[in-house]
């Protein structure tokens, strides 16, 4: 499923996303985060030891809801799967790019020895207000 133009626009802007993964007991875990896209996938930068990373390593299903910071009714929901993780220097550069977009400066938090990873999300289904007729 190719990403909708509205989804790409929202993912390229400084809009927060809610990332939903499944805990080991099946309960959903929903957390706000920064989001990005390469035009084909959504990209979520995290630390490999975080619960969301452990969740998708076990069960790659993921839902990402992006809402415009200017208009909460401008949103896109992507249900999909994590199809790859990217680490190393690329993930480090990516978190700095995201931080520049969201706060105007390089990432300030200390990055531990585990480093950072990018969760690469392939969309299976998308929902936007336009697809609902709104």
Predicted regions and their residues:
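Residues at secondary-structure transition points
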Residues: 2-5, 29, 47-51, 89, ...
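Short beta-strand segments
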Residues: 14-48, 54-56, 63-66, 75-78
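Charged, gly/pro-rich active-site loop segments
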Residues: 1-2, 74-134
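Amphipathic alpha-helical interface surfaces
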Residues: 7, 49-55, 78, 90-95
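AMP-binding (ANL) adenylation modules
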Residues: 69-71
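Extreme N-terminal tail/first-helix region
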Residues: 1-16
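Alpha-helix boundary recognition
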Residues: 9-12, 57-58, 112
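Charge-dense, helix-prone N-terminal extensions
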Residues: 8, 38, 133-134
